[in-house]
């Protein structure tokens, strides 16, 4: 059913998708495109893709499935260009970390009888640093891959079959698939993905202010410090779009954390501190 795949964006996720597909047994053609030529060359050398496309739109036209593996606003831009030129024999999917704006664009540009299908996706997998050189065939193994499909989508029999086939390949890559409403998706990931990132960013920035001129003090913190600040190495270029497209949900989560920290600060010498540790321990056990 799926013989040709175009991966638009050969950074960490795009390259990992190509490698994971090969590891899962995909034998069709995989074409890659990247805004920066070096990323595509690295993906090609790693055998995540078979060829490099000069034009992303042409690569999409010549494929059965197009995977958008670029930041969210770049995804939205590509959707605007692809929607009018792809027919009902095509599937477009993405790996973006927020879904509401992408689903709104998909309803307007895709999922109509004479147009390509669009399946919004979000693999809950990644690393603190990006780039094709860090591509990993096992990145999605054991991870959750979220879908926020529109139950009212109108699809041809062929594009519906492509959707089913892509879901099967995601499972073959080792992921567990879960379907969510896009609004609920964005609320949920604000807590379980975006909040941890912004906590790590704030903590790392604070420590840089406090001890950045004494790098030997970083070693004093040991493993706990390294684990808490690992995500502080994440690139702004990716998280900017997440912050811009999920602002309200992230603000809600950050405000709740601010209030919790204030509560903790005020109870450092009361029995409430034990309650907080017990609640935290319960979360880690369950």
Predicted regions and their residues:
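NAD(P)+-binding Rossmann beta1-loop-alpha1 motif at the extreme N-terminus of oxidoreductases
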Residues: 1-62
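Phosphate-coordination loops involved in phosphoryl transfer and adenosine-cofactor binding
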Residues: 2-4, 89, 142
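N-terminal Rossmann-like NAD(P) cofactor-binding module of classical short-chain dehydrogenase/reductase
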Residues: 66-67, 93
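Glycine-rich, N-terminal phosphate-binding loop of Rossmann-like dinucleotide-binding domains
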Residues: 70-71, 96, 149
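Rossmann-like NAD(P)(H) cofactor-binding subdomain of soluble oxidoreductases
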Residues: 78-133
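Internal alpha-helical scaffold of NAD(P)-dependent oxidoreductase catalytic cores
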Residues: 139-230
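Interdomain hinge/lid region at the active-site interface
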Residues: 213-281
């Amino acid at each position: 059913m799926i013989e040709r795949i175009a991966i638009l964006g050969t950074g960490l996720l795009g390259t990992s998708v190509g490698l994971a597909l090969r590891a899962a047994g995909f034998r069709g053609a995989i074409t890659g495109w990247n805004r920066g030529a070096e990323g595509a060359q690295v993906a090609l050398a790693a055998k995540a893709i078979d060829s490099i496309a000069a034009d992303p739109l042409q690569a999409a036209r010549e494929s059965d499935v197009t995977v958008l593996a670029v930041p969210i606003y770049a995804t939205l831009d590509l959707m605007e260009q692809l929607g009018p030129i792809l027919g009902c024999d095509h599937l477009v999917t993405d790996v973006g970390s927020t879904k509401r704006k992408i689903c709104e664009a998909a309803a307007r540009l895709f999922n109509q009888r004479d147009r390509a299908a669009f399946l919004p996706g979000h693999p809950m997998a990644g690393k603190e640093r990006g780039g094709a050189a860090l591509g990993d065939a096992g990145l999605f193994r054991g991870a959750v891959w979220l879908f926020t499909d529109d139950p009212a989508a109108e699809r041809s029999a062929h594009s519906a079959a492509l959707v089913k086939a892509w879901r099967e390949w995601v499972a073959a890559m080792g992921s567990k698939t879960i379907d969510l409403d896009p609004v609920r998706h964005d609320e949920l990931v604000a807590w379980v993905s975006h909040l941890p990132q912004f906590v790590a960013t704030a903590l790392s920035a604070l420590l840089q202010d406090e001890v950045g001129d004494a790098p030997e003090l970083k070693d004093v913190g040991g493993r706990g410090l390294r684990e808490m600040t690992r995500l502080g190495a994440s690139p702004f270029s990716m998280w900017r779009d997440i912050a811009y497209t999920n602002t309200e949900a992230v603000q809600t989560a950050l405000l709740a954390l601010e209030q919790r920290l204030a509560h903790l600060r005020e109870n450092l010498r009361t029995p409430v501190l034990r309650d907080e540790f017990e609640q935290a321990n319960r979360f880690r056990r369950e």
